[in-house]
Amino acid sequence: MDVRQMKIKAAELALSYVENGMRLGIGTGSTAEEFVRLLAEKVADGFKVQGVPTSERTARLCLELGVPLMSLDELPELDLTVDGADELDRHLTLIKGGGGALLREKIVAAASSRVIVIADETKLVETLGAYPLPIEINGFGGIATRISIEKAAAKLGLSGTIGLRMSGDDLFMTDGGHYILDASFGRIPDAVALSQALHAIPGVVEHGLFIGMASLAVVAGSDGARVIEPVA
């Protein structure tokens, strides 16, 4: 079973948690897109959902496939969000934002009664940090913000390269008009401390650490998909 097949298996199991008539947050990224395709097949057969996308990219795919959408202002309280992750640990602390939608993903997740994370087994790790941590920043004073992040990380014993994300020859820009710094710390032993330190920096809009937000994870491997609940 290749990685895409694993993603499909995870999406299939996650879809079983979606009930007819739900207000559904819909995530961003390659695994979330497999979920959208499967959801669209059910919608075509008469299944009812009201979807809230976490990015313009997800919105375009949903509209293309016929998944009905509303804005979060129209549906400010959601029953469930299904989204992917770039990394997750056994506590279901996540690194997200590889697709550049971390701010909207976090807002939608916070508005949801439950959050299900879908991933292939390569994303499940003992300690977060091998995947670079996305940090969304304001365009004003970006260098000063990066220096502040480096200093805050150093106080926590973290070091590594922190660089602006590019899109071809241009700086990558989020749907909200911000930039992203990708921080390659290698290992993040205390996600809570890092989260607090980053939130204290004025130029940081949001970061890709999702702590205590996931209700469960559906992780697929070569032997199929399984449900993982957070370890206290």
From Swiss-Prot:
GO terms for molecular function: ribose-5-phosphate isomerase activity. InterPro entries: NagB/RpiA_transferase-like (IPR037171), Ribose-5P_isomerase (IPR050262), Ribose5P_isomerase_typA_subgr (IPR020672), Ribose5P_isomerase_type_A (IPR004788). Coiled coil: none annotated. It comes from the Bacteria. The active site is at 105 (proton acceptor). GO terms for biological process: pentose-phosphate shunt, non-oxidative branch. Pathway: Carbohydrate degradation; pentose phosphate pathway; D-ribose 5-phosphate from D-ribulose 5-phosphate (non-oxidative stage): step 1/1. Substrate binds at residues 28-31, 83-86, 96-99, 123. Keywords: Isomerase. It catalyses: aldehydo-D-ribose 5-phosphate = D-ribulose 5-phosphate. Its EC number is 5.3.1.6. The keyword Flavoprotein does not apply. SUPFAM superfamilies: D-ribose-5-phosphate isomerase (RpiA), lid domain, NagB/RpiA/CoA transferase-like. Homodimer. Catalyzes the reversible conversion of ribose-5-phosphate to ribulose 5-phosphate. Belongs to the ribose 5-phosphate isomerase family. This is Ribose-5-phosphate isomerase A. The gene is rpiA.
